[in-house]
Amino acid sequence: MTDYSKTVNLLESPFPMRGNLAKREPAWLKSWYEQKRYQKLREIAKGRPKFILHDGPPYANGDIHIGHAVNKILKDIIIRSKTQAGFDAPYVPGWDCHGLPIEVMVEKLHGKDMPKARFRELCREYAAEQIARQKKDFIRLGVLGDWDNPYLTMDFKTEADTVRMLGEIYKSGYLYRGAKPVQFCLDCGSSLAEAEVEYKDKVSPAIDVGYPFKDTAALATAFGLAGIEGKAFAVIWTTTPWTLPASQAVSAGADVVYQLIDTPTGKLVLAKDLAEDALKRYGFSDGIAILAETTGDKLENLHMNHPFLERDIPMLNGEHVTTDAGTGLVHTAPAHGLEDYAVCNKYGIELYNPVNAEGKYIGETPRVAGMRVWEANSVILQWLEETGNLLASSKIEHSYAHCWRHKTPLIYRATGQWFVGMDKAGADGKTLRDKAIKAVDDTEFFPSWGRARLEAMIEGRPDWVVSRQRYWGTPMTFFVHKETGELHPNSAELLEKVAQRIEEKGIEAWFSLDKGELLSAEDCEHYDKLSDTMDVWFDSGSTHYSVLKQREELDWPADLYLEGSDQHRGWFQSSMLTGCASSMGRAPYKQLLTHGFVVDQNGRKMSKSIGNVVAPQEVYNEFGADILRLWAASTDYSGELAISKEILKRVTESYRRIRNTLSFLFANLSDFNPIEDAVQQADMVEIDRYALVLARRLQERVAGDFYPRYAFHFAVKEMVSFCSEDLGAFYLDILKDRLYTTKADSRARRSAQTALYHITRSLVLLIAPILCFTGEEAWDIIGGGAEDSVLFHTWHEFPTINEKAEAELVKKWTAIREAREAVTAAIEPLRADKTVGSSLQAEAEITAPEEMAGYLNALGEELRFALLVSKAEVKVGSELAVAAKASDGEKCERCWHYTRDVGAVAGHETVCKRCAENVGGEGETRHYA
C-alpha cells in the first residue's frame, strides 16, 4: 500500500518559527561588526544621491532610557529605508559632552578642591565612560552607524569649530554684552537657556502693596480733579515680594482705564476692570467712593515713594501691563524681569541689582542684607505692615519656572552676560528673529503642527544668553577691554588663532594660554581673557557646522533633524539660530520630525517612584531588540507612546504573524532555484499573477509612501495586514493544495513558487528597516548568503504587467474574494454544529450577479480550489447568496478533498483521480487557482 504522506511536498523551513531574538541578536551584531557591514555599505552607496539625517547628540550622562531608544530606533528606520530606496544615507552618531550635570557628577565623585585643569580632565574622562556605556546599548538596539567614529562635542576639532561658529556670529553682528535679567538657578550658580527651564506649580505669597504718591496735586490733575485730600496710593500686586527691594518704577497700561477710589485707607488707584475684586481682597465693602476715572497715559511721569525704602518711583507706561489679574499696575524691577528691563531701558532708568550670584542681597540692602531671596519674603511682608503699605496678603498656586536639573525655582537676575540678539540688526541689516521666522517657513514639518509651535517660540523668545560661568565647557575665546568691556578690535583673527590651538590641544589651550602669546605688550595692559564658557546648547546647536560641514561623507544642510517634541525649545531652535546668524544664513535642516514622550499604559510619565519605568535593556533582554523596534514603529509617535509588558506582548503577536508567514514562505521555497525554476509571468497561474499585484501594491504603499513620509505605524499595519489577510487568510490558504499536492517540478507548483519568491524578497526588504535582525536573518536565506546584507539591495523589482490587464485581474479576483468570504460565512454554522470540520467537507451553491457569476464560472473546475470547498456551483441571481451543505463525497487520503472519484484509478484506492494523476501520471494542469 502506498504511503501517500511521502508523495506530498511538505518541506522543512530553514527559517524557524521561534525567533529566539534575545539570545541570537548579539551574535548577529558581532558578525556584522566583524564583516564591517557599515563600511561596506558606504562603498556600495558611493555616488548615490545623499540623504543626511543629523543626529541630535544625547547628553553623556547615565544609561539610556526608553525615550533614547525610541529616538535612535526611529532614526535607524529612516537611515535603513532611505538606503534601500537608493540613497547614500550615512549615519554619524554624536554626544553632547560639556555642561553642568557632568560637573556635578565629577564634584560628587572627586570633590571640588583641585586645580581647574584637573577638574576638566576628570570631566572629560567621565564623559568618555558614559559614552562607552550608552554606545553599547544603542548598538544593541540594532542601530547602524559609524560607531567607531562618532562626533563628540568635546573632541578637540569639534571644540575648535564651535569656537569658529562663535566667530561667525560675532562677524555677523548679532553678539553683544549686556547686563540683562536672565533665568538664573541659585543651585547651578549660573544663567540658564530657554531649553533648560521647565514649568511646575509653586505656592507663592500674593500681596497688594501701596506706593504713596508724592504729589497729590499732580495726581488730581491726571484725574481731572481740582485737588485731593489725604494720602493716595498706586496699588501693585505681586507674587515675588523678594523683588521689591529692586523696585525702581511702577508701570501702567497707556490705554487701561484707572479709577481713583476713596477708601478708609486712603485714595487708591486701581484698574477699573480689577477694582471690584481688589477692594474685596482689602475687605472694603462700605465707605468707598469712585472719585474719577482716567487712562494710564495720563498717569505717566507721576512720582511715588518706595513702600519701604527711600527711593523715588516714577510711573511709566508699559505694553506688558494687562488687566488679567492683580490691580492693573505693575511694580517694575529691571534687574528681575525682562519686561521690566525693557520698559526701564526705554525710559533710560539705570538698572539696580541688589541680589548676588548666590541669591543673597548685597550689603547695602537694609534688613535683608546677606539673606537669600526666598527667606526674605516674610521679612519684607513684616516691613510693609510696619510702613502701613500692605493692603492684602494671601497664598497662590501658579505655574513657575524651575531648573530642569535641580527642580528648584528660578529667579530672574540681571548679570553681565553675552547675548545673541534676536532683534538687533546684523551686518546684513536683518534681524535674527526675521531670518529665523523665514527659516521656519522654508522647513517641512512632521507632524505639521510643529511649524506653528516653533514659529510661536521664535516669535516670543528673548535674546539668547550664550555665556555661562562654568568650567567644563567650550570657552568664549575673546579678549575684553578691562575698562570698557569692549572686545578686542582684532577679535576675528585672534579667535581663529585660538581655534587652531584648541584643534591641537583642546579647550585647555585657551585656559592655559598666556595672553602675551597672542597680544602685544600694550594690549596685554588693557585686555583680559574672557573666563566665560558657552551654553551647551551652543555646542550642540553648532554641530551642523562642526560636523556636517567638516566630514566628507556628510553634507550641509541636513535633510532631516529628528528629536523629541521638547527640542522645539532646544536643539531645533539653537541649530536654527546658529545657522541663521552665521554666514550660512538659513536653518541647517530641510525637514524637522518630532516624536512624543513615552508613557505607561495609563498615560502616566515614567517615574521610579511610581514604579512604571520600562528600561530598554530589560525589553531587549527579554523580548529582543526587534520587538522594541516593532513597538516603536507601530506606535503613532506624533503623540505619546505607551509601553508596558502587556503592550509588548501584543506587539509580539504582530511579530509572530510576520515571522510565521516568512517561515511558511521559506519552507515552500526550499527546493526552488529562481534561475532554473522561475516561470515567466505570462505562463503563471492567474491567482499567482494577482498575488504579485497585491505584493507590488503593498511595496508601493510602504516603500513609496509610508517610509518617505515617516509614517511607520501605517507601514507596520499594512505589512501585518498583508501577512494575515492577503496571504494567510487568502492566497496561502488557497495555495497550500497546489504547493503540497501537485508534482514538485510542475508548472502549477513552480508558478506558485515564482510568486512566493517575489513576494518573499519584497516582504523581507520591506520589513528590514524596522525588523533589522529578522530582516537580515531572512536575507541570509533568500539573498546572497552570510556576507550579503539586505541593506546592500534596493526595493524589489516585480515583473511588469499591462495596466489594463492589471485592473481587470484585480477586479476579477476582488469579486472572487468577496464570493469566498460569503462561502466561508455560509459554512460557519455547519462547522459550529459539527456538521463539517474543515471547509473541504462542504459543497457550495452560489447565486451571484451576472458579472461576478461570470468571473466565478471562468475558473471552471478550479473554482473549488479558490473557494476551499470540495465542490462549487454558480448560478446568476440579483444578489450574492450562498447555500452550503456537507459533501456526500469520500475524503481523499492525500489532498483531503471530498470527491466522488476516490478509488477511481486502479492501484490508488484511497485517493482521488487528481491525486492519482499527480502521483503516477504527468500531473494536473492549473490555469486559475
Swiss-Prot record:
Q: Where is this motif: 'HIGH' region?
A: 58-68
Please name the NCBIfam families in this protein's record. ileS (TIGR00392)
Gene Ontology CC terms, in alphabetical order: cytosol
Q: Which CDD domains match?
A: Anticodon_Ia_Ile_BEm
Catalysed reaction per UniProt? tRNA(Ile) + L-isoleucine + ATP = L-isoleucyl-tRNA(Ile) + AMP + diphosphate
Q: What is this protein called?
A: Isoleucine--tRNA ligase
Q: Where in the cell is it found?
A: Cytoplasm
This chain's source organism reads: Neisseria meningitidis serogroup A / serotype 4A (strain DSM 15465 / Z2491)
Q: How does it assemble?
A: Monomer.
Query: Which GO biological-process labels does this protein carry?
Result: isoleucyl-tRNA aminoacylation
What does the entry note on its domains?
IleRS has two distinct active sites: one for aminoacylation and one for editing. The misactivated valine is translocated from the active site to the editing site, which sterically excludes the correctly activated isoleucine. The single editing site contains two valyl binding pockets, one specific for each substrate (Val-AMP or Val-tRNA(Ile)).
Instruction: Tell me a Gene Ontology molecular-function term this record carries.
Output: zinc ion binding
Q: Which InterPro entries match?
A: aa-tRNA-synth_I_CS, aa-tRNA-synth_Ia, Anticodon_Ile_BEm, Ile-tRNA-ligase, Ile-tRNA-ligase_type1, Ile-tRNA_ligase, M/V/L/I-tRNA-synth_anticd-bd, Rossmann-like_a/b/a_fold
Cofactor(s) this protein cannot do without: Zn(2+)
Q: Give the protein's function.
A: Catalyzes the attachment of isoleucine to tRNA(Ile). As IleRS can inadvertently accommodate and process structurally similar amino acids such as valine, to avoid such errors it has two additional distinct tRNA(Ile)-dependent editing activities. One activity is designated as 'pretransfer' editing and involves the hydrolysis of activated Val-AMP. The other activity is designated 'posttransfer' editing and involves deacylation of mischarged Val-tRNA(Ile).
**Membrane spanning residue stretches:** none
Note on cofactor: Binds 1 zinc ion per subunit.
Q: What is its main location?
A: cytoplasm
EC number per UniProt:
6.1.1.5
Instruction: Write the record's keywords in alphabetical order, separated by commas.
Output: Aminoacyl-tRNA synthetase, ATP-binding, Cytoplasm, Ligase, Metal-binding, Nucleotide-binding, Protein biosynthesis, Zinc
Q: What would be one Pfam family of this protein?
A: zf-FPG_IleRS
Residue numbers binding L-isoleucyl-5'-AMP:
E563
